[in-house]
Amino acid sequence: MKKALLALSFVLCATLAMAQYRNKDGNRIGITGGVSQTSLFNSNFVTKPGIGFNGGLSVRGNYYNNWSMIYGMQFFQNKFSIETTTSSLQKKESEFNIQGAQIRLLLSYNVVKNHVSFDFGPVLQINDKLKTANSDQNNTITGTNLKAVQLEEISKVNGNVYVGISAGNRRIRAIVHYQYGFTNLLNKLNSEEDLVLLNNNTKFKGNLGTISGQLLFNL
């Protein structure tokens, strides 16, 4: 996982450097950072959204008339809670977190040039395991016979759809965007028949939905 993230970082940095070198006026390199709220949409568990964070780099280039393209990568940590039952039979919202990197290629329509844009496109997500606190790992997922720790091995490569809007000037912009995961984050769990049985003999299905607020600083 770490090697993959380092490779992705190298590719992005090299691409951004080349873009800036080739056309300093047409391309803008930006640094972003912000907070996110993530929900796990599924019919297996009782869940609640949680607060995470993200940050990364991007390059915006002129494309055609009022259209631009954005290529970027960001690192993220998303969080959400799943209702569990402790060994003392107490209900508890156990927090889970997922970390990884995303590569996105977006089309951007300049509603007001250099000030307001509408952005959309696909996102490739590479993430680590689904993790929870050591103290919660043996809690039972409400409505199932699963232990929290048994949800760790999720799908590592996922795809999202990105829709967002940004507003500001050439140097600083505020960004609000939403991502929906169109792939099944929990699909890898379906390869383990024992886990499916513990899940009431029901296939696992879960899609992430994340809304983020960010600040972008153009170099």
Language-model segments: residues:
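Bacterial Sec-dependent N-terminal signal peptides
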Residues: M1-R28, T32, L215-L219
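Membrane-proximal, glycine/serine-rich, low-complexity loop/turn segments characteristic
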Residues: Q20, V116-G121, Q125-N127, I175-Q179, ...
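Outer-membrane beta-barrel channels and translocator barrels
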Residues: K24, N62-N66, V112-V116, R170-I172, ...
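Membrane-spanning beta-strand positions in outer-membrane beta-barrel proteins
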Residues: R28-G30, S68, L106, H115-S117, ...
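Residues on the lipid-exposed face of transmembrane beta-strands in outer-membrane beta-barrel proteins
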Residues: I31-V35, F53-G61, M73-F75, I103-Y109, ...
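Glycine- and aromatic-enriched membrane insertion/assembly motifs of diderm outer-membrane
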Residues: T47-L89
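Helix-adjacent hinge/juxtasegments
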Residues: Q90-H115
